[in-house]
Amino acid sequence: MKKYIFSLALIMVSLTAFAANKPAKVYMFGFAASFNDSTVCFTDIQEVDSAYIDSKTKFLYSRENYSYQLRDHLEEQGFNAPTCITIFAFSRKNIEKKYARLRRRYTDSGKYIVKEVSSPSFAYQAIKFEE
């Protein structure tokens, strides 16, 4: 009986240790700020069809690499030392709420110069899952 319980527990642990990453459609936008001046940048809300999501944590796989894509693009455009974040959601409605909240924070105060990074000049490329 002990062997049966032990082997069942071992199987359960091994199954939960490997969380599957599944491609999914997500909506995302990027935000960049510089600590050197008062300029902030927003990308458009973009739909990415094949972004990988960790099925266990529901978190975007390799999110930092999406932020690096934005950082590299802004540096090519002459933006000095941008600090970038990428925000995602599974529904258009949720991402629009997040976008509006963050944008309002920077436009209402009048302290920041808000710039747009439009879709034709910048689009997120899906990050491939690597095991």
Q: Predicted regions span which residues?
A:
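Positively charged n-region of N-terminal signal peptides that target proteins for export
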Residues: 1-4, 19
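Generic structural motif
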Residues: 4, 34-36, 92
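Sec-dependent N-terminal signal peptides
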Residues: 4-15
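Intrinsically disordered, low-complexity boundary segments flanking structured domains
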Residues: 17-18, 69-75, 101-102
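N-terminal secretory signal peptides
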Residues: 19-64
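Acidic/histidine-rich, surface-exposed loop or edge segments in extracytoplasmic proteins
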Residues: 48-53, 75-86
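Tryptophan-paired
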Residues: 60-75, 79-80
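Surface-exposed, polar helix/loop patches in the mature regions of secreted/periplasmic/lumenal proteins
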Residues: 79-131
